[in-house]
């Protein structure tokens, strides 16, 4: 990563008034942080070692865990949802593959009035507020990944969070990863939009079990993607093979575009994305607390074309 490119990326953040950090490749597996502050309020500064709600960037964590269970032959892409949740309407017609690529036909857009406490409450809420459209076309729904998280838990006889800690956080020494319930507002950059309350943030993250309940620092998220995703070419190849059969090339938590994988995360007050070349391991991430989803999408596209050269 040369100085000139770093300057260009910083200029991009500055000219678009993005309060946040970008992470790009440094030496080896390490990341270089590019920071732009649009505020002097320390409570609102985004930092590479400060917790940040992962939102949908968590889906690839869940997808990776599912892949590893598939490798151990504990489940397969064709395994029926009925195996784990026979009480769900139409579960016999839904496979793990369809949960991984958002073609399950399941929908759930409800949010609780109060944050859900613990995995049991999260699963109960999910099951009560779910409906089945019985169509197997692309529909980006968090509930697919909430179910995958619940399946992981049933399969390994541990809570989802405990399993993620044992499987990824411990071996990779990720010390900045917490469930929403363990996080205080002080530990997270507060949204720059005063209309967004901490209550909104906790309600959203608590009901995105497996698809946004975890907070991670940008550095820890980089470490996870670099080691567990980009470091596993067998998995990315398998995900690509699965994704390219679909109307939308998506599988396991990421979109595919040739050798590029990418994902966006968005909850009230927080937006983030990553784009990586899974062959060369070139990668860029963006975490911000003052832009909306449309600005995030535009920034992600700009990075894809101007930085990743895709």
Model regions: which residues?
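A general structural signal for short secondary-structure boundary/capping elements
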Residues: 67, 128-134, 143-148, 298-310
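Short, surface-exposed loop or secondary-structure junction motifs
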Residues: 92-260, 264-268, 272
């Amino acid at each position: 990563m040369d100085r000139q490119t770093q300057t260009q990326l910083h200029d991009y953040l500055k000219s678009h008034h993005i309060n946040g950090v970008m992470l790009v490749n440094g030496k080896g597996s390490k990341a270089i942080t590019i920071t732009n502050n649009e505020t002097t309020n320390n409570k609102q500064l985004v930092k590479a070692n400060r917790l940040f709600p992962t939102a949908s960037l968590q889906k690839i964590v869940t997808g990776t865990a599912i892949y590893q269970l598939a490798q151990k032959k504990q489940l397969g892409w064709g395994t029926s949802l009925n195996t784990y949740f026979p009480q769900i309407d139409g579960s016999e017609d839904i496979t793990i593959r369809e949960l991984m690529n958002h073609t399950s036909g399941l929908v759930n857009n409800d949010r609780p009035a109060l944050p859900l406490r613990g995995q049991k409450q999260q699963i109960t809420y999910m099951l009560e507020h779910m409906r089945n459209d019985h169509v197997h076309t692309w529909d980006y729904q968090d509930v697919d990944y909430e179910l995958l998280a619940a399946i992981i838990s049933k399969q390994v006889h541990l809570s989802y969070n405990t399993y993620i800690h044992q499987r990824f956080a411990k071996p990779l020494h990720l010390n900045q990863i917490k469930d929403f319930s363990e996080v205080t507002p002080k530990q997270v950059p507060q949204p720059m939009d005063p209309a967004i309350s901490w209550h909104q943030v906790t309600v959203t993250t608590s009901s995105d079990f497996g698809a946004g309940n975890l907070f991670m620092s940008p550095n820890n998220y980089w470490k996870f993607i670099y080691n567990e995703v980009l470091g596993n070419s067998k998995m990315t190849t398998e995900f690509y093979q699965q994704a390219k059969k679909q109307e939308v090339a998506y599988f396991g938590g990421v979109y595919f575009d040739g050798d590029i994988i990418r994902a966006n995360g968005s909850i009230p007050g927080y937006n983030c994305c990553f784009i990586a070349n899974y062959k060369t391991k070139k990668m860029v991430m963006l975490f911000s607390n003052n832009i909306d989803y449309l600005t995030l999408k535009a920034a992600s596209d700009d990075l894809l074309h101007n930085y990743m050269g895709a």
